[in-house]
Amino acid sequence: MAGMLEYKCPCCDGAIQFDSATQKMKCPYCDTEFDVDTLKGYDEELKDEKPSEMEWATPGGSWAEGETAGLHTYSCKSCGGEIVGDDTMAASACPFCGNPIVLTGQFAGALRPDLIIPFKLDKKAAKAKLQEHLKGKTLLPRVFRSQNHIDEIKGVYVPFWLFDSDADAQLRFTATQTRCWSDSKYDYTETNYYSVRRDGTLGFDAVPVDGSSKIEDDLMESIEPFAMQDAIPFQTAYLAGYVADKYDVSAEDSIERANKRIRRSTEETFQQTVTGYDSVKVDNSSIQLHGGKAKYALFPVWLLSTSWRGENYLFAMNGQTGKFVGDLPVDKGAARKWMLGLTAALSAASYGVMWLLWLARIL
């Protein structure tokens, strides 16, 4: 791997330097010393490391002749969103920002999706989930439940890029075991540090990255997962009664996010195998991704837009599983009371602990 090689101290995580006076590697932060030979193993691990390379097969296909005859493109002049609907679509508001949309012409100029997960839940289920989402929220203004107005509920097929890849991983973790004891004068803490290595290969299928810039990535990730066993070859018939968001983030521009998700999952999966320690953290990782493929899919999402006191609130529900997410307003008065109550409880608990310690000393 190109760049500067840096050794980290397993005790404090500081950068280790070579000390010419002692001819050893020394941490300038905690003064721990290491023989140079002990670091040769690290060099061997990195010697053959190569930069990550990933080639993706082109997703999506071409539309058959006449397949898009009944599809039309609508655009929002406010947020720039583009959606696709059939002749039966009666939408007049943008599902992303709530502003009016206009018909701009016959649908054209986009890849044909490879897969689609049809809607399993209807509009009635989305309304019920919203009411369920409001329950048990102690800091939610009481009048919000009755005064919030649902401006739009729209079933939208959101574009997703699905990435497959294999990950060859070499990871090194720093793990610790801590032992504490006391005598009549002092309290002692002994911490032992261990270097743990894991090697292996993981396969990833259908890692989703949404292809729409109009919907927050965090919002879409929050309603995951989608059950891929329900994904079927795309047919335009499934768009009837719904709208489909046109992708405006290409597969190529989505690769970086896919790589980050795959790398993060790889590190977490291998870290879960390092057991029997009090703490474990990643010290170094070399992950090579290969065999990459990408597919273009449409996933079902219910978008609910509500307004209250001049503010708009957007909620999303997984149209397959019913998972529901969305931000809610906070009652500032209730929040202050809750914080005061929490502060009082913590103060009382601290006083109680101090009183018990004082009582233990006099006894």
Positions of the model-derived regions?
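Short, non-ligating residues that shape and space the ligands of small metal-coordination modules
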Residues: 18-19, 36-37, 85-86, 103-104
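Final/C-terminal transmembrane alpha-helix of multipass membrane proteins
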Residues: 337-356
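Intrinsically disordered, low-complexity segments
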Residues: 2-4, 35-71, 105-132
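Extended, hydrophilic extramembrane loops/domains of integral membrane proteins
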Residues: 299-328
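Charged, low-complexity helical/coil segments in non-catalytic cytosolic or luminal regions
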Residues: 111-307, 358-363
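Short cysteine-rich clusters marking metal-coordination/redox-active sites
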Residues: 9-12, 27-30, 76-79, 94-97
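Cys/His-rich metal-chelating microdomains
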Residues: 13-15, 33, 81-82, 100
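Residues immediately within or flanking Cys/His clusters that coordinate Zn2+
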Residues: 4-6, 22-24, 69-73, 91
